[in-house]
């Protein structure tokens, strides 16, 4: 095999994928080269950034696109609407910072102390200015990602075999963190309101706490339901955790994406010192600026004893380019880029909610208060096409050694086959996720319209059969 095989394959995917996408989003779509040129002018007239031009991610080992092609087959997926990262060209301030550092062609060890000081200055200023949270240097630790930070914290507070509280449906990655920390899940269902939104069930939460419960992973804004938890919600849940000596691990990675008229309340901002001291907050630039592959995050706490316990379990081997990318992100230009993106995403969630509820038969959703993720209830449609029977039939006849599939995975396959759109199957988000799919709208409006129109065509065709 040629040593250039991988590069050739990626080049093919880039050209084929982008040509297909641009050809589908509207008449007169530019060629690949023209699209790249258009994308280069990221900030145009009036200081506005261009989020409308689809940006090619095919052939870059993207989980959202290339992994789905690997799983479902070449040409199977036209639009990836699953994994939680954004499709936009990076903020120019990030790209410039990375290009400048690449000009210095040496990649030796980085001074971790100096790097942490730089990251702290940017992050603490950002959190104080935008969210009113003051972070002291002694309260702040840089890590290689929210997952490594959570795993170290779980190992510090939850002995092997003990339980960790999760309010479900919740981010599926938490279950991997529990596996890595040798702990067990304790799902607590969120209440479902009449309009399809969700609320905390405080009585059920407290009843689930036992002598083996040491930690609770809070997701705020909540992935995948889109809740921005109120101060009252957080105070009540914080009181329960403090009463039962359950440590709060607050994952607030989606906090920069909040819909108009909604509010994100940091757990660290609560007006009760004892509750705040019983918590650790985890954040990163990865969701806000599309930096997941750069592997840099941080956590902080007002409780020195908690941090000392975590440090014993934690080691962060960080990389130079992750640091540089974050410096470019947390700049005045980066902040303006993000402000415009948040407004753009808010328009996407409004558009998508209206479209789903009016044009996708048998599917319901609601506009999220935060995140760029939407939680789609396919119950009526899934029961109509018989996904439970599909799963039972498949599992009865599947090849030996192959894993069993859930009804949500059968729906995932059905949508790929009939709409060429990939959504995340709901079964992995914990209890209360039956017949649900997660959709990411962190993409160009044209790409979003393509995905939704594909879904509408497929679902209406199936419904009329």
Residue ranges and their predicted role:
Residues 156-178:
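Conserved PLP-anchoring active-site segment centered on the Schiff-base-forming lysine
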Residues 278-358, 363-370:
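PLP-dependent aminotransferase class I/II
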Residues 181, 243-244, 419:
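Helix C-cap/helix->beta junction micro-motif
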Residues 44-145, 152, 330-332, 462-465:
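N-terminal small-domain helix-loop-helix segment of the aminotransferase-like
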Residues 344-353, 365-381, 387-396, 433:
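Conserved glycine-rich beta-strand-loop-beta hairpin in the small C-terminal domain of fold type I
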Residues 192-262:
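Active-site phosphate-binding strand-loop segment of PLP-dependent enzymes
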Residues 1-21:
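N-terminal secretory signal peptides and thylakoid transit peptides that target proteins
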Residues 391-398, 402-465:
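PLP-dependent enzyme catalytic core of the Aspartate aminotransferase-like
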């Amino acid at each position: 095999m040629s040593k250039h095989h991988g590069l050739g394959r990626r080049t093919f995917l880039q050209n084929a994928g982008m040509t297909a996408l641009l050809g589908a989003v509207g008449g007169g779509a530019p060629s690949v080269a023209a699209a790249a040129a258009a994308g280069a002018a990221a900030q145009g007239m009036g200081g506005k950034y261009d989020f409308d031009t689809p940006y090619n991610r095919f052939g870059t080992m993207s989980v959202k696109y290339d992994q789905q092609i690997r799983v479902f087959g070449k040409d199977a997926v036209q639009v990836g609407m699953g994994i939680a990262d954004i499709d936009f060209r990076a903020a120019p301030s990030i790209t410039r910072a990375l290009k400048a550092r690449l000009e210095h062609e040496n990649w030796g060890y980085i001074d971790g102390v100096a790097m942490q000081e730089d990251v702290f200055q940017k992050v603490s200023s950002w959190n104080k200015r935008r969210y009113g949270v003051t972070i002291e240097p002694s309260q702040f630790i840089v890590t290689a990602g929210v997952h490594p930070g959570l795993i170290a914290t779980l190992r510090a507070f939850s002995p092997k075999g003990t339980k960790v509280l999760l309010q479900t449906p919740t981010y599926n990655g938490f279950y991997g963190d529990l596996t890595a920390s040798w702990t067990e899940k304790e799902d607590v269902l969120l209440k479902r309101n009449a309009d399809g939104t969700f609320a905390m069930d405080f009585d059920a939460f407290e009843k689930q706490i036992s002598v083996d419960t040491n930690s609770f992973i809070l997701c705020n804004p909540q992935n995948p339901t889109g809740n921005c938890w109120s101060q009252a919600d957080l105070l009540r849940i914080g009181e329960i955790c403090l009463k039962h000596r359950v440590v709060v691990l607050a994952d607030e990675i989606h906090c920069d994406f909040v819909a108009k008229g909604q509010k994100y309340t940091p757990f660290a901002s609560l007006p009760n010192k004892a509750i705040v001291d019983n918590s650790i907050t985890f954040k990163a630039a990865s969701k806000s600026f599309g930096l997941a592959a750069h592997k840099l995050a941080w956590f902080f706490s007002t409780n020195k004893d908690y941090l000392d316990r975590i440090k014993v379990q934690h080691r962060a081997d960080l990389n130079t380019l992750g640091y540089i990318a974050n410096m470019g992100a947390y700049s005045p230009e980066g902040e303006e880029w993000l402000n415009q993106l948040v407004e753009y995403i808010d328009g996407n969630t409004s558009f998508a909610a209206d479209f789903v509820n009016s044009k996708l038969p048998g599917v319901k959703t609601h506009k999220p208060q935060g995140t760029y993720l939407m939680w789609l209830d396919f119950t009526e449609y899934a029961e109509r096409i018989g996904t439970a029977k599909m799963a039972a039939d498949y599992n009865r006849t599947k090849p030996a050694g192959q894993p069993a599939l859930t009804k949500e995975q059968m729906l995932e396959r059905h949508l790929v086959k009939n709409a060429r759109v990939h959504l995340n199957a709901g079964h992995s988000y914990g209890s209360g996720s039956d017949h649900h799919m997660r959709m990411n709208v962190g993409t160009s409006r044209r790409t979003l319209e393509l995905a939704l129109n594909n879904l509408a065509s497929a679902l209406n065709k199936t419904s009329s059969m």
